Amino acid sequence: MSLQRAGDGADVQAGADQIGDLFYPLYLRLFDEDGDFVGDVDTKLSEARMADNVEMYISRSLGIGVIAGLLLWLVGLMLGYALFVLVGMNVSVGLPVSPGMADLIETLKIPLLVFVMGLVFGSIGFGIGFGTLIAIPYSRASARGREINMLLSDAVSFMYALSVGGLNQLEILEAMAQADDTYGEVANEFQSIVQETKYFDTDYRTAIRNQAMQTPSDELAQFLTDMLSIINSGGDMTGFLDEKKRKHMRTAKQQQEMTLETLELFGEMYMTLSLFPLLLVIILVIMGIMGNSTDTMLLGTIYGLTPLLGVGFLVMVSTVKQDDPGDGYLNPSDASDRLSQNTDSGLMNLGLVESFTGEYAVFDRVKDREGTHTTLDIMKAPHVFFRDNPTYTLAVTVPVALVILVVAIADGAVPIRWQGLCEAKSALDASTVSCGSDQARVTEEGSKIVVEQGMMHQPVWGTFMYVYMPLYVIVVPLAIFREWNVRSRRRITNNLSENLRKLSSANDTGQTLLDATRTVSDTSSGKIADEFETMYAKVNYGMSLKEALIEFNNKYHIPRLARTVKLISKAQEASSQITDVLSTAAQSSENQDDIERERKSRTMMQVVIIIMTFLTLLAVMAILKTQFLNVMAGLTDQASGGGGGGGGAGGASFNASVNVDRLSLLFFHAVTMQAILSGLIAGYMRSGKLASGLKYVVVLATISLVTWMMVG
């Protein structure tokens, strides 16, 4: 299968190269190879670490743009022909012209309109195709720059720890290049420096200078430039890194402040964006009462515009808000087989025994016994397993939700039609028709004889079974176990800074790092103290301290913890007295605590704004349903029952144009979608993860359900 995938990728790349070769002459005609645009794209390709050369990339972009433009040009021609020829849409400018000129304009009008529509659609297609490909390196370079800026403070602290440990400049660069499991894109930038010196016979000063010009991060470029000055002048590298470490800690706080200010602006924008569909729905309902048919626009607003605005807002927030980079796992290249296997172990991988199966039967039996033991452990404490693996709840809850829904549909307990079935006026063709059909039989009181109820007749129950039941069965367990998982892992980082200070103080008294962990575990309480005690026991039984630290980190796989463990484990390899390194780790952790505390306090207001905006929308929808639609329907029924001419005419007009049950269903669906979107947005703005919004989704959706049970 891997060979097949590789072949498919090669075919795609070959096709892209053919498009680039085909449109290369057009590139030469349109663009100057020494121009600003070509140079800018070349720079972004380098910053994004994309292997394409600028000539072929722009040529390929032109080809994709031309193909997309031709396709949309054909769509525009067909749409124009359908509108102006088949439908006969009349377009008149109203210019005063002579009769002869009017005849000429009338003759050329339709061909010109069709041509112009095709031209407009073709231009849009070319812009989308060409612009999208050109935007890719800009987007990737920007994302890399943001990640580098986020990790630079910790990366400089890591380099400082290496310098304190006695490593020279080249060794620091090489160690930084190998730390890609922790420092991500920052390590990739240093990999470029090391590889240039290793494979291209370039001295490392020139390589640093070149990378300073190619990196997408201005902060890293300035750091490399200043570092080069220290190297050239023979200055104190340790003092330089200590100064830069403090500077970038302050810079990290300033960047967090800018991000929070932008999120506050987005929170204010959300109020306007989310209320726009509500205002449009109100206008469309009023237009419907006045006799104008707006079914398509109403459906498009509720089922199209509302989710589109929510998803668009999420995308907009994602451009400025980024989660802590990395997955939190440490995978050193010199790790033992036991550590590597335990890191990859899980439900489908039993760890070290996997590497011995297949050669000897005894290991196959060990694997079977290990699998049985693991299964029994899960069955004895399934809540612990789901706490550590929240997404595995989907393997249980999704089938349960499907079974409940299928059984309910099979028993006829859930409506399966939108409008239901009613008795037909004439049973020649069929005894029942859709309740929305004109052929449905009407009683003397003006009501239709319903044979099978649809979603409009049971808006709350039908929506509950199709939306809320899966929501509660699937999302509630996932949200509970995920929140439990987050809180259990957070217990490690809550006291991390304090315990690092204790480690530093103990190490300063002359204790080794191992003895310091024992001292801290004896004098502290909480989860991290228990982990220190476990770590001490592992080392006493023969494990190296580095591997014990890595196992401790991989158990919780928190990116922030991974950077701290990487810092300490690398420093303790050089010396057992690492007081300065531990103090640096504690200072970096305290800086992260301050940033996290500020983020929580500032984003809480944005969450409140989002929730209050949703509650306002829900209240307006409920009032519109109870105080307007229900009252109008009641007045219509009274007028019809009284038999008055004017009242009867008004009632017939209202009944013909507005279906109260249908509008109630649409309003309920609108507030339900808004609840789901508002919950996801609130969670994403709060912590940078969509999954953290699940608890808000459940709460807001429940409020919507209870409200509509009372008003619907």
Protein language model regions, located:
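Generic N-terminal leader segments that precede the first folded domain
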Residues: 1-177, 181, 185-188, 638-649, ...
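Membrane-cytosol interface segments
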Residues: 1-52, 92, 303-384, 391, ...
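Short, Lys/Arg-enriched, Gly/Pro-containing loop segments at transmembrane-helix junctions
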Residues: 144, 322-332, 634-636, 692-694
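Bilayer-spanning, highly hydrophobic alpha-helical transmembrane segments
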Residues: 58-83, 122-129, 254-316, 402, ...
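Membrane-interfacial helix-loop-helix connectors in multipass membrane proteins
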Residues: 79-115, 205-215, 286-298, 413-463, ...
